[in-house]
């Protein structure tokens, strides 16, 4: 009897989405980039901590750039050419993440700042005295 080799690997489904959303959450400690389609279904994500940056290095602009490039390289097979960028948070990785999207070769259609602004809601954290 001949032994039959079976492969249980799934084939990659190549979808042609064309247009998507990129959400950049830039906090003081980390940067998280999520790529979704127009309906809001998440396709890929990456964070500075997941990319190997630890401690204070997570909040650098270079870490945000590498994170954005990694998240967009994951969705290269989906055929996304145009993106809408939504930025949330006060972190310093905001601008460098947007520049990384442009350097990858994707066309940025719009940039929106969706940082939540309180109308005198919760009491803020105490100011640091260094």
Swiss-Prot record:
GO BP terms: translation
InterPro entries linked to this entry: Ribosomal_uS11, Ribosomal_uS11_bac-type, Ribosomal_uS11_CS, Ribosomal_uS11_sf
Domain of life: Bacteria
Gene3D superfamilies linked: Ribosomal protein S11 (3.30.420.80)
Family the UniProt entry places it in: Belongs to the universal ribosomal protein uS11 family.
Subunit relationships: Part of the 30S ribosomal subunit. Interacts with proteins S7 and S18. Binds to IF-3.
The protein, known as: Small ribosomal subunit protein uS11
Organism: Borreliella burgdorferi (strain ATCC 35210 / DSM 4680 / CIP 102532 / B31) (Borrelia burgdorferi)
Gene name of the encoded protein: rpsK
